[in-house]
């Protein structure tokens, strides 16, 4: 059999193969092996054994053996290694059955795609996420029994207008909420973003746009072309890898955490979605904003299950510091054409082929495999049960009087609430065995540990508020 990997190894004299997978929390992991061992066809049938008990939320030590099964279609050269290295994304396989591990996020995403086909609603779901991030010059933080702190260093930050800078303070920097999107020199990050885009293109992603985002201190976005669900989740992990490593090469540091700065915009990951059947966009129609009834029902499913979705789309305590009014983060579970204060937006498009919906509440802390799969399952449940989203909200939802605002459902206010909603509202996720109860239980337990740790940790602001009581 002919393998793409074998050709790349031979053509580029590849010395090492890097096997990658994503854990439950969304962090990409890897193990590296000599390229000569990947030239055997058996490698793509038998995979590589590893210890699953070392991955949080997976196996116990008494049954820890698992298999990394490489996906040859994902083979790509790593532009950051000194020695020629080939990257292969892997699925996690259960050795006893040689089937996909039910807690492997990539396998969950694959099952979601298969479930879509089984419903007859469509054969392909297209996903286009927009993960935002911050580029800092340096960051320091600590949290232990002696105290806690964090400090961000950013030459372009608005708070550095009077700072002593070795190369001189040139004064050109975006203010709070002023980063969208002046030309250089106010945009300090143009060159590094371009380098990031070059690396992304080298790794096979199709860059559509890059720009500075709203917040000061280096908030940025790189827009990449949409793809099918699993492929796009793979690409999100590639994007994070590229962005982190280019920043490191420039002597800078990147974070995808949703709200690193108090008082300025946080980073979202708006997710564009549409479903195709027999090559036709099922979301295009003659209804509101050019949507079909199918698309409206899809929106209805996301709105109905919005709070449960938060457990996967906004999976950190920090996520809920972003989801507050006043910083362009949507907190109202409503939909509208072009209205960015609604949690579901219908972007303007010139062609029905591009008709889609945009979920605006997710953030880049999310595991992309789990978030995209969960959004799809919510939308499909809406279609199957004909859940209409009601009237569109074409006014600024941030300015609604209290009596109107209370009639509109909102996203969760905390990770604790999101996990509780996920626990009690999970039925739409377990259809077709896409998400299993065992996985959801393990996920909730894993994320609850984070929530409890943050909730019980002594916060520096508490000293400011209460030290002198």
UniProtKB/Swiss-Prot annotation:
Protein family per UniProt: Belongs to the glutamine synthetase family.
PANTHER family: GLUTAMINE SYNTHETASE
Residues at which L-glutamate binds: 265-266, 322, 328, 340, 360
Source taxon at top rank: Bacteria
Disulfide bonds: none
Domain GS catalytic: 105-469
Descriptive protein name: Glutamine synthetase
Binding site for Mg(2+) 2: 132, 213, 221
Chief place of localization: cytoplasm
Gene: glnA
Residues where O-AMP-tyrosine is found: 398
GO cellular-component term (any): cytoplasm
Binding positions for ATP per the UniProt entry: 208, 272-274, 340, 345, 353
Enzyme kind, highest EC tier: ligase
Cofactor(s) listed in the protein's UniProt record: Mg(2+)
EC numbers, comma separated: 6.3.1.2
Organism, as annotated: Pseudomonas aeruginosa (strain ATCC 15692 / DSM 22644 / CIP 104116 / JCM 14847 / LMG 12228 / 1C / PRS 101 / PAO1)
UniProt-annotated binding residues for Mg(2+) 1: 130, 270, 358
């Amino acid at each position: 059999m002919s393998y793409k990997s074998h050709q790349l190894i031979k053509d580029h004299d590849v010395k090492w193969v890097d096997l990658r997978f994503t854990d439950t929390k969304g962090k990409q992991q890897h193990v590296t092996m000599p390229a000569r061992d990947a030239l055997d066809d058996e490698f793509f049938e038998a995979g590589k054994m590893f210890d699953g008990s070392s991955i949080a939320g997976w196996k116990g030590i008494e049954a820890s053996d698992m298999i990394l099964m490489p996906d040859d279609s994902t083979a790509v050269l790593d532009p950051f290694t000194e020695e020629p290295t080939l990257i292969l994304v892997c699925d996690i396989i259960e050795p006893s059955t040689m089937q996909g591990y039910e807690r492997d996020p990539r396998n969950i995403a694959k099952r979601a795609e298969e479930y879509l086909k089984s419903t007859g609603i469509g054969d392909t779901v297209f996903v286009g996420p927009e993960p935002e991030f911050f580029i800092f010059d340096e960051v320091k933080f600590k949290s232990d029994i002696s105290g806690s702190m964090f400090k961000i260093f950013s030459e372009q930050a608005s708070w550095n207008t009077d700072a002593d800078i070795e190369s001189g303070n040139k004064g050109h920097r975006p203010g709070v909420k002023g980063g969208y999107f002046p030309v250089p020199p106010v945009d300090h990050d143009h060159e590094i973003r371009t380098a990031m885009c070059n690396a992304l293109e080298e790794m096979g992603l199709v860059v559509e746009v890059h720009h500075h985002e709203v917040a000061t201190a280096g908030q940025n976005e790189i827009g990449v072309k949409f793809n099918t669900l699993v492929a796009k989740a793979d690409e999100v992990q590639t994007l994070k890898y590229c962005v982190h490593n280019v920043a490191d090469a420039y002597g800078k540091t990147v974070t995808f955490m949703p709200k690193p700065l108090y008082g300025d915009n946080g980073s979202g990951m708006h997710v564009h979605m549409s479903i195709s059947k027999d090559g036709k966009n099922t979301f295009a129609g003659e209804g509101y904003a050019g949507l079909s009834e199918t698309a409206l029902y899809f929106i209805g499913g996301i709105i109905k299950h919005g709070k449960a979705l938060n457990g996967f789309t906004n999976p950190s305590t920090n996520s809920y510091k972003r989801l507050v009014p006043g910083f362009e983060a949507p907190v109202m579970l409503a939909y509208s054409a072009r209205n960015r204060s609604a949690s579901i937006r219908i972007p303007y498009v010139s062609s029905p082929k591009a008709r889609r919906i945009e979920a605006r509440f997710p953030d880049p802390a999310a595991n992309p495999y789990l978030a995209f799969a969960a959004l799809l399952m919510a939308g499909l449940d809406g279609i199957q049960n004909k859940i209409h989203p009601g009237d569109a909200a074409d006014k600024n939802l941030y300015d609604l009087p209290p009596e109107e605002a209370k009639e509109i459902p909102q996203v969760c206010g905390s990770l604790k609430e999101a996990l509780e909603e996920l626990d009690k509202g999970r039925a739409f996720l377990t259809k077709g065995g896409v998400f299993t109860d065992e996985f959801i239980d393990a996920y909730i337990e894993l994320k609850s540990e984070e929530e409890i740790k943050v909730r019980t940790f002594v916060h520096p602001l508490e000293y400011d508020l209460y030290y002198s009581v």
